């Protein structure tokens, strides 16, 4: 397993050494980082799968136990479940890599689907599944158990490789086997981050704006193409988290998204030529989602939201209803 320059391993190793020089991290810094990543990873991982809770709403649900009007019970459970699973990951991360066993993976998956699909939580699938909109053919359910046994044998055999290589490969293989009916992507990202944390690396933070490149890079590799694009995304996600750690050690508040990169709804309207009323209507219909909300209540959008607005208009010109457009734009579980 040699990924070479695609993962920029030397740079990641140097950043790890720099971080090690600051260890043990001051308790208040460590606590702040863990709480920040708890919300950020929960928000981003769920958003990658179509959850419409914003970053601020995710924090309200996870930290305060409150509900958000207009959001489904499943979306609330996805937030609280992922946060609970991530807390479990932080607890397990203190154990050696060799202790990763099947029961840990199944327990994490059970936590992800708790209250959402209890019948399948923590269990391998027994039926065929497909990735919506993808040409990838997933393993026959009768072969899942054998594939997973091989997966864990290979995971142990990778012990001498670079931790970021191991984490990326574990994530890739798990979503490719697709052992569960639902929750494969979230569980794979938890496993990837568990491996990183066990080895002293920060978790990989895959941004919501990287969703399409992330999904396309996985599909490309699964169809027999190069893993280069996928590995670059994972590498940059780890580098991004290193920057957040160093930011916190420098006395700054962790921040994955620079507000200057985001658009207020008025800016988005000007950029796209749409009215505020239209954009707000699309938000209510679940077609358009803010990336964040300021303390003053201003909704902020990723620059890529302009492309989504254009796509909505294109689908409307094809005479699709709003419900059909929402379905077309809906997230594809990986």
Residue ranges and their predicted role:
Residues 1-182, 186-290, 294-299, 317, ...:
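FIC/Doc superfamily catalytic core
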Residues 303-322:
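Terminal helix-turn-helix DNA-binding modules in bacterial transcription factors
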């Amino acid at each position: 397993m040699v990924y070479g320059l695609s993962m920029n391993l030397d740079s990641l190793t140097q950043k790890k050494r720099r971080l090690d020089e600051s260890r043990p991290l001051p308790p208040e810094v460590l606590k702040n980082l863990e709480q920040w990543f708890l919300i950020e990873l929960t928000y981003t991982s769920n958003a990658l799968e179509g959850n419409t809770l914003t970053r601020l709403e995710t924090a309200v649900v996870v930290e305060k136990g409150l509900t958000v009007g207009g959001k489904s019970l499943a979306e609330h459970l996805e937030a609280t479940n992922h946060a609970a699973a991530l807390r479990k990951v932080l607890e397990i991360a203190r154990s050696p890599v060799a202790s990763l066993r099947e029961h840990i993976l199944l327990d994490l998956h059970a936590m992800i689907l708790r209250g959402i699909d209890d019948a399948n939580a923590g269990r391998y699938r027994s039926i065929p599944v497909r990735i919506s909109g993808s040409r990838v053919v997933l393993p026959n359910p009768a072969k899942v158990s054998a594939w997973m046994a091989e997966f864990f044998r290979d995971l142990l055999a990778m012990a001498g490789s670079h931790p970021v290589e191991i984490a990326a490969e574990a994530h890739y293989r798990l979503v490719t086997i697709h052992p569960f009916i639902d929750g494969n992507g979230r569980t794979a990202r938890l496993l990837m981050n568990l491996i990183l944390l066990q080895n002293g690396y920060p978790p990989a933070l895959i941004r919501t704006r990287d969703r399409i490149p992330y999904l396309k890079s996985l599909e490309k590799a699964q169809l027999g193409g190069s893993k280069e694009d996928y590995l670059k995304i994972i590498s940059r996600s780890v580098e991004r988290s290193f920057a957040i750690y160093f930011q916190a050690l420098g006395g700054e508040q962790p921040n994955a998204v620079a507000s200057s990169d985001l658009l207020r709804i008025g800016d988005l309207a000007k950029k796209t030529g749409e009215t505020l009323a239209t954009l707000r209507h699309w938000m209510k219909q679940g077609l358009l989602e803010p990336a964040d909300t300021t303390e003053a209540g201003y909704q902020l959008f990723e620059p890529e939201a302009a492309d989504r607005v254009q796509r909505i208009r294109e689908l409307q010109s094809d005479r699709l209803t709003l419900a059909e457009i929402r379905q077309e734009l809906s997230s594809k579980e990986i």
